Amino acid sequence: MAKADFYETLGVAKSADEKELKSAFRKLAMKYHPDKNPDDKDAERKFKEINEAYEMLKDPQKRAAYDRYGHAAFEHGGMGGGGGGFAGGGFSDIFEDIFGEMMGGGRARQRSSGGRERGADLRYNMEITLEEAFSGKTAQIRVPTSITCDVCSGSGAKPGTQPKNCGTCQGSGRVRAAQGFFSIERTCPTCHGRGQIIPDPCPKCHGQGRVTEERSLSVNIPAGIEDGTRIRLQGEGEAGARGGPAGDLYIFLSVKPHEFYQRDGADLYCAVPISMTTAALGGTFDVATLDGTKSRVTVPEGTQAGKQFRLKSKGMPVLRSAQTGDLYIQIQIETPQKLTKRQRELLQEFEQISSKENNPESTGFFARMKEFFEG
């Protein structure tokens, strides 16, 4: 069967530069890597093709020969002494060089000697009220997670027995296989990368070193915490496998929308509707605040819609600070509805005796508009 074109294999144009080649290879190699596709022959074949294509095209001399002669340049010794493999370390060194930053030095899943694995990080979503965010609280949560097995103390082995080094990989958790030009390192199929096998598994955890259980945890929520804040509880995630360290638990907080207040950082906003007569004649009203007290707001006569009154230090506490935000009262003027005959007569009479001085904004606006359009 004819070999696929190297450029098509990587999904790049023949004019692709080194950066484009590397980016295409990285995406495809991550997608078809044997560790992510165990026992998948098609993925393994695709992975080998990707490796071969990238190795040839990243080398300027090999790429020039391929561009001129195609695959024939590498058949029957066509490359002379230049078509060998990799100098020192084989393909895994190249793979680790490219993916090192993402793979933590080329070893995924944070395994250590003896097959110990760090437990997974867990996420817990918690919703609190604005009042709770204002005052802070200590919450009790129940989290289903994996904990260290109390029978084998996390080793995974039956009490009185010990895990043994894997005979296939000699305890390394990795095996190498020669594939033409390449030496590919992959997870040991016998121990699945742990480096050890457990001949006599623990009867409770079946060799995993951990069991699933629901735990109760206390979470401290500080005053002033904001919507979307993440709280990290170190070591409270999933237990590590076979004695490995535990992961972390992340609490993602959301604050419920409040019936009266909207929050912007440490400041609070409250829209308060008042009657037309209160706006015109002035008056007072009380506002309940989150600290449990009431604040009196004085409305001067002639107050317009949209007017804001600031209540200093009546907002939210600033997280880990002695400062406090402000509460802003935003005035909305309610227009009377369902008027009685007498009310209508009084308003009509008021309209008749009103002057420009009573409504300077509307009078001035319409005068300016008329002048603008009529000249």
Swiss-Prot record:
Which keywords does this chain's UniProt record carry?
Chaperone, Cytoplasm, DNA replication, Metal-binding, Repeat, Stress response, Zinc, Zinc-finger
Cofactor notes: Binds 2 Zn(2+) ions per monomer.
Record-linked InterPro entries: DnaJ, DnaJ_C, DnaJ_domain, DnaJ_domain_CS, HSP40/DnaJ_pept-bd, HSP_DnaJ_Cys-rich_dom, HSP_DnaJ_Cys-rich_dom_sf, J_dom_sf
Q: Quick one: which residues bind Zn(2+) 2?
A: C166, C169, C188, C191
Q: Which GO terms describe its molecular function?
A: ATP binding; heat shock protein binding; unfolded protein binding; zinc ion binding
The reply to whether ATP-binding figures as a keyword in the UniProt entry is no
- Record Pfam families: DnaJ, DnaJ_C, DnaJ_CXXCXGXG
Gene Ontology terms: biological process: chaperone cofactor-dependent protein refolding; DNA replication; protein refolding; response to heat
Any transmembrane segments, and where?
none
Q: Where is the J domain?
A: 5-70
Q: Where in the cell is it found?
A: Cytoplasm
Domain notes from UniProt = The J domain is necessary and sufficient to stimulate DnaK ATPase activity. Zinc center 1 plays an important role in the autonomous, DnaK-independent chaperone activity of DnaJ. Zinc center 2 is essential for interaction with DnaK and for DnaJ activity.
Quaternary structure, from the entry: Homodimer.
What's this protein's function? Participates actively in the response to hyperosmotic and heat shock by preventing the aggregation of stress-denatured proteins and by disaggregating proteins, also in an autonomous, DnaK-independent fashion. Unfolded proteins bind initially to DnaJ; upon interaction with the DnaJ-bound protein, DnaK hydrolyzes its bound ATP, resulting in the formation of a stable complex. GrpE releases ADP from DnaK; ATP binding to DnaK triggers the release of the substrate protein, thus completing the reaction cycle.
HAMAP family linked: DnaJ (MF_01152)
Its protein name is: Chaperone protein DnaJ
Task: Record the organism.
Answer: Rhizobium etli (strain CIAT 652)
